[in-house]
């Protein structure tokens, strides 16, 4: 039996999961670790050295368990990057999208380009932390450093480079930069050059299932075995959507630190209505498009828990919020919730400023977050149906957030649609599917989705009005 290894690193945690593909998919978690933003040199950064060390730790644990995967691939969150100098050394820390360096930058870039033009060419949602604005901020604030940049690698590209010595920009993650043309599927040199970016620092765009080759000899010696590094959809949501068991007449909701809600489509939708609703057309497997909206997600409850000094588990916060009729809600996409000093106080201030009852008890704060998320999902569903001029029958929640039964039921109640929850490890599964397709163990995404449907439990939630 051949094993493959998915390295799935989210904005709050990472895991290494070994998968076997036979009549059913079997998963074994090998290693799990935390991922936290650190403050360094006055900026919010990712500790990429520590993350790479965790990847190597997971590989060593494979060997210790008597498991030697034949392949591996890495996925992470989107938009963040590492710039390398002429010696292939990082020029700066890996600054997080939550850093305020991009405050006001998006508006400055839009002044140079008509908003409609940027959207028509890239199809990407306008968010202040998109890569395009991070690069522009770096160029403006540290021009000397920016001029030295010879290679642009997104976070998973950088880890793949460290493992193999091969540089490439994987397609699904590259599209989130707002610098890839949605129709040519190549770097948009007109935009890149107009903003004063060096087009030569961007690498060849490669597709999921393409191989980067074997590990560098130093890592083979350290971890004790060799394997093939195969590109998955390196944007975690891109991998997660591959694992949606059924996509016909279904809206997917990838629920984690971020919530990404949308549909799979064969072409980009760059119409005015999609721009007005602020939807994005991110690249997917096989040049499919993930037409979706980014919503703040479970980051808010993660921060609430942290503000309570981790006295409550996530399950306890859910339990405390059950049976509470607290109805105050906040706009979860308000930038004030991106990186507040204290999430609980920010939620309370928002409620006070909007004339609503401010939550006080932990259960009330949690219920406010869950109700607010469900409300934002419901609005996004209505917008999707307006754009497509059709009703979708169901919503499939995937990722870690699908374990939140209270939130799943709130979504069903508010949208009046059937909600299906699972699989939980959708991202790792989608990552593995790309590897198995490259290795010839799975022929198509359609075959993979049937296999996923047969392999994992999916729970159904029905609106209370329809029970």
Curated annotation (Swiss-Prot):
Active site residues of this protein: 236 (proton acceptor)
Annotated disulfide bonds: 351-368
Needed co-factor(s): Mg(2+)
One term under GO cellular component: cytosol
Keyword annotations of the record: ATP-binding, Disulfide bond, Kinase, Magnesium, Nucleotide-binding, Rhamnose metabolism, Transferase
Group of enzyme by EC: transferase
Keyword ATP-binding: yes
GO molecular function, one term: glycerol kinase activity
Pfam families: FGGY_C (PF02782), FGGY_N (PF00370)
Segments crossing the lipid bilayer: none
Entry's Gene Ontology BP terms: glycerol metabolic process; rhamnose catabolic process
Reaction equation(s) it catalyzes: L-rhamnulose + ATP = L-rhamnulose 1-phosphate + ADP + H(+)
Pathway: Carbohydrate degradation; L-rhamnose degradation; glycerone phosphate from L-rhamnose: step 2/3
Positions contributing to substrate binding: 78, 235-237, 294
InterPro entries: ATPase_NBD, Carb_kinase_FGGY, FGGY_C, FGGY_N, Rhamnulokinase
Signal sequence bounds: none
Residues the entry annotates as binding ATP: 11-15, 257, 302, 400
EC number: 2.7.1.5
Family: Belongs to the rhamnulokinase family.
Cited function: Involved in the catabolism of L-rhamnose (6-deoxy-L-mannose). Catalyzes the transfer of the gamma-phosphate group from ATP to the 1-hydroxyl group of L-rhamnulose to yield L-rhamnulose 1-phosphate.
Official protein name in the record: Rhamnulokinase
Gene: rhaB
């Amino acid at each position: 039996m051949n094993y493959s290894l998915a390295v799935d690193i989210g904005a709050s945690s990472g895991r290494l999961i070994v998968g076997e593909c036979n009549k059913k998919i079997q998963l074994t978690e090998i290693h799990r670790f935390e991922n936290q933003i650190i403050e360094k040199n006055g900026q919010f950064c990712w500790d990429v050295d520590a993350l790479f060390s965790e990847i190597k730790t997971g590989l060593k644990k494979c060997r210790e368990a008597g498991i030697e995967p034949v392949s591996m691939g890495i996925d992470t969150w989107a938009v963040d990057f590492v710039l390398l100098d002429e010696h292939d050394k990082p020029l700066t820390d890996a600054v997080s999208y939550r850093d305020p360096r991009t405050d006001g930058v998006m508006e400055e870039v839009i002044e140079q380009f008509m908003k409609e033009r940027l959207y028509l060419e890239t199809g990407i949602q306008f968010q202040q932390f998109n890569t395009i604005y991070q690069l522009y901020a770096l160029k403006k604030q540290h021009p000397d450093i920016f001029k030295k940049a010879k290679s642009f690698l997104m976070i998973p590209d950088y880890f793949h480079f460290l493992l193999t010595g091969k540089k490439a920009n994987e397609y699904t993650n590259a599209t989130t930069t707002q610098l890839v043309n949605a129709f040519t599927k190549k770097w948009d040199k007109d935009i890149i050059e107009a903003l004063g970016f060096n087009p030569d620092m961007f690498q060849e765009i490669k597709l999921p299932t393409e191989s980067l080759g074997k590990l560098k000899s130093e890592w083979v010696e350290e971890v004790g075995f060799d394997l093939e590094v195969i590109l998955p959809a390196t944007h975690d949501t891109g991998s997660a959507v591959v694992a949606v068991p059924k996509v016909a007449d279904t809206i997917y909701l990838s629920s984690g630190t971020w919530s990404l809600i949308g549909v799979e489509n064969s072409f980009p939708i760059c119409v005015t209505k999609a721009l007005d609703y602020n939807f994005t057309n991110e690249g997917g497997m096989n040049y499919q498009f993930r037409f979706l909206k980014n919503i703040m997600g479970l980051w808010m409850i993660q921060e609430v828990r942290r503000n309570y000094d981790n006295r409550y588990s996530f399950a306890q916060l859910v339990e405390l919020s059950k049976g509470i009729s607290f109805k105050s809600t906040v706009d979860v996409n308000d930038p004030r919730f991106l990186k507040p000093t204290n999430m609980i106080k920010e939620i309370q201030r928002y409620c006070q400023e909007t004339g609503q009852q401010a939550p006080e008890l932990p259960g009330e704060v949690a219920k406010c977050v869950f109700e607010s998320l469900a409300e934002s999902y419901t609005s996004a569903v209505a917008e999707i149906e307006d754009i497509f001029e059709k009703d979708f029958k169901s919503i499939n929640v995937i990722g870690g957030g699908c374990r939140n039964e209270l939130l799943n039921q709130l979504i069903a109640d508010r949208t009046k649609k059937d909600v299906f929850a699972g699989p939980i490890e959708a991202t790792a599964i989608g990552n593995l599917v790309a590897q198995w397709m490259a290795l010839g163990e799975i022929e198509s995404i359609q075959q993979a989705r049937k296999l996923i449907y047969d392999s994992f439990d999916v729970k159904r939630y029905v609106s209370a009005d329809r029970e």
